[in-house]
């Protein structure tokens, strides 16, 4: 059996790409930051310590998920035509990586908000490359 040569521009079918994963993970980072902020200032019990440890672990895992999702889309999906139309995508992707790292390193809620805003802009650009209209809504 002879296999014909095939060509593809990415590792997986493009239909798999969706920045929604990064958006959900970024929102989760903010939620975990909020929950960490609600913890008592002084941890007295093993139960509270275990809870805080789990919250921090989950915050960090979701920040990593943001980075993985954005890196995959940026590295595998964006090609020259999209980059020409949206030249900010390189700086934005790098900024998302740095902001996600800040979220891992600290518990400042503003870092989480910044991450959500940057990931939302990334998603907006992604969908614009597919000529899909998006809209932004403020939460209540």
Region locations from a protein language model:
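Short, solvent-exposed, charged loop/turn and helix-capping segments
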Residues: 69-86
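Alpha-helical segments in soluble extracytoplasmic regions
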Residues: 52-67
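Short helix-loop boundary/capping segments at the starts of domains
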Residues: 35-38, 65, 69-72
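N-terminal intrinsically disordered, cationic/polar leader segments
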Residues: 1-53, 82, 87-119, 125-140
């Amino acid at each position: 059996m002879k296999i014909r040569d095939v060509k593809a521009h990415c590792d997986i079918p493009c239909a798999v790409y969706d920045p929604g994963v990064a958006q959900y993970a970024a929102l989760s980072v903010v939620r975990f930051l909020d929950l960490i902020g609600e913890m008592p200032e002084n941890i007295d019990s093993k139960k509270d310590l275990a809870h805080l440890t789990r919250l921090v672990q989950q915050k960090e895992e979701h920040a990593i998920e943001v980075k993985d999702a954005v890196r995959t889309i940026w590295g595998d999906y964006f090609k020259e035509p999209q980059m020409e139309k949206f030249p900010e995508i390189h700086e934005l992707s790098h900024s998302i990586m740095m902001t996600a790292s800040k979220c891992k390193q600290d518990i400042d809620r503003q870092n989480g908000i910044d991450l959500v805003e940057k990931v939302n802009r990334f998603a907006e650009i992604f969908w614009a490359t597919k000529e899909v209209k998006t809209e932004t809504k403020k939460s209540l």
